Curated annotation (Swiss-Prot):
Name of this protein: Thrombospondin-4
Domain (TSP C-terminal) ranges: 731-945
All copies of domain EGF-like, residue ranges: 286-325, 326-363, 379-419, 420-462
Domain Laminin G-like: 27-192
GO MF, one example: integrin binding
Any one of the GO CC terms: endoplasmic reticulum
Function: Adhesive glycoprotein that mediates cell-to-cell and cell-to-matrix interactions and is involved in various processes including cellular proliferation, migration, adhesion and attachment, inflammatory response to CNS injury, regulation of vascular inflammation and adaptive responses of the heart to pressure overload and in myocardial function and remodeling. Binds to structural extracellular matrix (ECM) proteins and modulates the ECM in response to tissue damage, contributing to cardioprotective and adaptive ECM remodeling.
Organism of provenance: Homo sapiens
Length: 961
């Protein structure tokens, strides 16, 4: 037995000698901090130690026991005056955490948290805190629990240099004893090596992970590695030395007992029988017993007849009971693949599951435990935890996930979110009211519009008798069109109410509430009881924009409140009328290329002198330069048409290069062709040479929701591909009188309301038109038609494709059959019902065109009847009708429908005519007063309706047969 012990001692000697040769650390200086210690250090004396700038390493060692799940501050250094913390170590049992707080150099407290520590479990624990370089910055902290390193923290901020209080105000506090709790040891150690300090707790450190070398050079790294590997061997040497001391003591006692017996006495036999005595037997060594602690620590020892017998090695070790070697459970792969396994002495610990997985941090002892308690990490289904935006496709992968596009029925992306994609074709995804029409706009947007005879926001619709887009009763929605109609039976889409009495002006007999009925009131919409009228025109002073000048038209070009009749600068351009070459058109530059005295801004022939501005055919082109040569029939003569051979009545030229969009290969002039490679341009009307399209929907980012960049989003833009037209507006209009000669009747009087979306004609007049200035290619035109009187029974309607006063389409409705009272130039008979006519008059406005319009049927060289309602039913007094017109001049498609309430009462069906290839819109009257055209709407639309293809197929088959 001596040989192995001697070898172990020799090995220990060599290791220690090598350590000494490498340079031993200074002797540790130990301060006992327990209040019961006779050598207890005054807390104030700790400060010079803790704030010594030459101090590199500082150690705190403590032994304690806490009840399960309890929390306590083990020790701390505080100011007795303001209770501020300098240093504190706290255990939080319920959270399995420990917290170290210390005062930083900037006067703030720094906090270090140690997780997954079971310190409050009713068992005795030893901790060792090693703090390094805290006075120099970038310090580090190591925590050892029961002789095993469990955590380390680096790059700690610099600690305090010293307190502002006097040393005698510094106070050390330890945790208050409770039943079954105790603080056995609390010491502060300065200087010395980690292994020297650890030995104070009877620890030969077995680290959970390799320590980083604290010195520099290959020798120090090699030395620390060897010391780590020999930690366990040193523990065994300690056991052997303890056993050797006990055996040596036993031998000494045995020898002493033998000497006490004295020398042996022999009786000399006779020579004849002398037998030489046998040599004395060597003393018998007593068998070794359990009281000499021969077994490995923790192994049960049993005395036996022959000495002792050791039980099996503890769980986590392997050996014969005397010598037990730690088992590396990590070799049996107890941890989840990819998770770091840490071999402990004894036992093992698995790190946390990888990112994207969830599972326990397994810790145990022994091969059996490692084999039967494998760490299980379950993939986290991030898709169930809302990793992607709602209503988008989420693909869960092992340890991760991937977000995809929006689910079917939703639109958007991972940045904007996925919103329900309203789908008009799928009833389940159609959000509209059953009494509303679902319209799919550009880029998939859906708009709900209440059907004819209904009003509301499209999601909720209520009855609307007068079809002016306001319901008869208020609806439970917040949109403007959910409010109750203030004139239930008279269409008034502007809901004007001058006296705010809740009754709209259109149906209020005293609209201004001054006690004077409208028929006698000279200011119908302005309260004026005195009815004063200085200039004796039809407008009282309260509403007259020229008090002393008779002006029944009340025209005010610049909208400054002063009528043109008394305004010396009608257009408000700063140039007096007498000097202004365009008195009704603002033009401060007064440019006049042809020198005819009429500025270019208002000159109907800017390049040809025409001072009288004669325009017989009312096409806005002066007679002096009007050639009427129009190759493509779109209403623009070839000399001014920006696409002379391509139909483009709208004359849109986005890039202002003189070439209309309809014949321009690059409308926005950004270098990307509209259709051919390297196009097509994903923003045809907005320059974007880089063609950015972040959501890959084929529409460039710059024009995603506003294709023409006119600052009106496509959903409410009446012409999403024309920046010059955004809303329906007839406030600017041209009056065209179709029978200017004679005095058979007077000219029409037009009143425009609701910001240009409602027109009222008040007089029993000659045939006339109010024509807007916006020209259209394909267009949808709708409005509500209402005759608000029981007097007379003549024509009212609307026009489209207007090119000049001799060329336009008209839809006109007569109430009763009647022969025109002027028999010259021919007898004209009007039949009741709706008529669709193409006007192409060789004479233009006059008696021929007048009688041709009145007559139901074709009139040579004047009017062709394209369709007539076969019912021969006239309009009813004070009943509202809604019309819908579709015109696609590129193919000659025309279709018009009329509704009474929600009932379709007339439908022209598909009508093909190419007489006018586009033009302007307006309204028409002939000998009928008090006509209301309400809730007017137009919309650019070049899409060919589906029924056109059906019509072509049917007619082709008919022709083929």
């Amino acid at each position: 037995m001596l040989a192995p012990r001697g070898a172990a001692v020799l090995l220990l000697h060599l290791v220690l000698q090598r350590w000494l040769a490498a340079g031993a650390q200074a002797t540790p200086q130990v301060f006992d901090l327990l209040p019961s210690s006779s050598q207890r250090l005054n807390p104030g004396a700790l400060l010079p130690v803790l704030t010594d700038p030459a101090l590199n390493d500082l150690y705190v060692i403590s032994t304690f026991k806490l009840q399960t799940k309890s929390s306590a501050t083990i020790f701390g250094l505080y100011s007795s005056t303001d209770n501020s913390k300098y240093f504190e170590f706290t255990v939080m049992g319920r959270l399995n955490k420990a917290i170290l707080r210390y005062l930083k150099n900037d006067g703030k407290v720094h906090l270090v948290v140690f997780n997954n520590l079971q310190l409050a479990d009713g068992r005795r624990h030893r901790i060792l805190l090693r703090l390094s370089n805290l006075q120099r910055g970038a310090g580090s902290l190591e925590l050892y629990l029961d002789c095993i390193q469990v955590d380390s923290v680096h790059n700690l901020p610099r600690a305090f240099a010293g307190p502002s209080q006097k040393p005698e105000t510094i106070e050390l506090r330890t945790f208050q004893r409770k039943p079954q709790d105790f603080l056995e040891e609390l010491k502060l150690v300065v200087r010395g090596s980690l292994f020297q300090v650890a030995s104070l707790q009877d620890c030969f450190l077995q680290q959970s992970e390799p320590l980083a070398a604290t010195g520099t050079g290959d020798f120090n790294r090699q030395f620390l590695g060897q010391m780590t590997q020999l930690n366990q061997l040193l523990g065994e040497v300690k056991d052997l030395l303890r056993q050797q001391v006990k055996e040596t003591s036993f031998l000494r006692n045995t020898i002493a007992e033998c000497q006490a017996c004295g020398p042996l006495k022999f009786q000399s036999p006779t020579p004849s029988t002398v037998v030489p005595p046998a040599p004395p037997a060597p003393p018998t060594r007593p068998p070794r017993r359990c009281d000499s602690n021969p077994c490995f620590r923790g192994v049960q020892c049993t005395d036996s007849r022959d000495g002792f017998q050791c039980g099996p090695c503890p769980e986590g070790y392997t050996g014969n009971g005397i010598t037990c070697i730690d088992v590396d459970e990590c070799k049996y792969h107890p941890c989840y693949p990819g998770v770091h396994c840490i071999n402990l002495s004894p036992g093992f610990r698995c790190d946390a599951c990888p990112v994207g997985f969830t599972g326990p941090m397994v810790q145990g002892v022994g091969i059996s435990f490692a084999k039967s308690n494998k760490q299980v990490c379950t993939d986290i289904d991030e898709c169930r935890n809302g990793a992607c935006v709602p209503n988008s496709i989420c693909v869960n992968t092992l340890g991760s996930y991937r977000c995809g596009p929006c689910k079917p029925g939703y639109t958007g992306d991972q940045i904007r979110g996925c919103k329900a994609e309203r789908n008009c074709r799928n009833p389940e995804l159609n959000p509209c009211s059953v009494n509303a029409q679902c319209i799919e706009e550009r880029q998939g947007d859906v708009t709900c519009v209440c059907g004819v005879g209904w009003a509301g926001d499209g999601y909720i619709c209520g009855k609307d008798v007068d079809i002016d887009s306001y319901p008869d009763e208020e609806l439970p929605c917040s949109a403007r069109n959910c409010k109750k109609d203030n004139c239930k039976y008279v269409p008034n889409s502007g809901q004007e109410d001058a006296d705010r009495d809740g009754i709209g002006d259109a149906c209020d007999e005293d609209a201004d509430g001054d006690g004077i009925l409208n028929e006698q009131d000279n200011c119908v919409l302005i309260h004026n009881v005195d009815q004063r009228n200085s200039d004796k025109d039809i407008f009282g002073d309260a509403c007259d924009n020229c008090l002393s000048v008779l002006n029944n038209d009340q025209k005010d070009t610049d909208g400054d409140g002063r009528g043109d009749a008394c305004d010396d600068d009608m257009d408000g351009d700063g140039i007096k009328n007498i000097l202004d070459n365009c008195p009704k058109f603002p033009n401060r530059d007064q440019r006049d290329k042809d020198g005819d005295g009429v500025g270019d801004a208002c000159d109907s022939c800017p390049d040809v002198s025409n001072p009288n501005q004669s325009d017989v055919d009312n096409d806005l082109v002066g007679d002096s330069c009007d050639t009427n040569q129009d190759s493509d029939g779109d209403g623009h003569q070839d000399s001014t048409d920006n696409c002379p051979t391509v139909i483009n009545s709208a004359q849109l030229d986005t890039d202002k290069d003189g070439i209309g969009d309809e014949c321009d290969d690059d409308d926005d002039n950004d270098g990307i062709p509209d259709l051919v490679p390297p196009g097509p341009d994903n923003c045809r009307l907005v320059p974007n040479p880089a063609q950015e399209d972040s959501n890959s929907d084929g529409v460039g980012d710059i024009c995603e929701s506003d294709f023409d960049q006119d600052q009106v989003i496509d959903r409410i833009d009446v012409c999403p591909e024309n920046a010059e037209v955004t809303l329906t507006d007839f406030r600017a209009y041209q009056t065209v009188v179709l029978d200017p000669e004679g005095d058979a009747q007077i000219d029409p009087n037009w009143v425009v309301l609701n910001q240009g979306m409602e027109i009222v004609q008040t007089m029993n007049s000659d045939p006339g038109l109010a024509v807007g200035y916006t020209a259209f290619n394909g267009v949808d035109f709708e409005g509500t038609f209402h005759v608000n009187t029981q007097t007379d029974d003549d024509y009212a309607g609307f026009i489209f494709g207007y090119q000049d006063s001799s060329s336009f389409y008209v839809v006109m409705w007569k109430q009763t059959e009647q022969t025109y009272w002027q028999a010259t130039p021919f007898r004209a008979v009007a039949e009741p019902g709706i008529q669709l006519k193409a006007v192409k008059s060789k004479t233009g406005p006059g008696e021929h065109l007048r009688n041709s319009l009145w007559h139901t049927g074709d009139t040579s060289d004047q009017v062709r009847l394209l369709w007539k309602d076969s019912r021969n039913v006239g309009w009813k007094d004070k009943v509202s009708y809604r019309w819908f017109l579709q015109h696609r001049p590129q193919v000659g498609y025309i279709r018009v429908r009329f509704y009474e309430g929600s009932e379709l009462v007339a439908d022209s069906g598909v009508t093909i005519d190419t007489t006018m290839r586009g033009g302007r819109l307006g309204v028409f009257c002939f000998s009928q007063e008090n006509i209301i055209w309400s809730n007017l709407k137009y919309r650019c639309n070049d899409t060919i309706p589906e029924d056109f293809q059906e019509f072509q197929t049917q007619n082709f088959d008919r022709f083929d047969n």
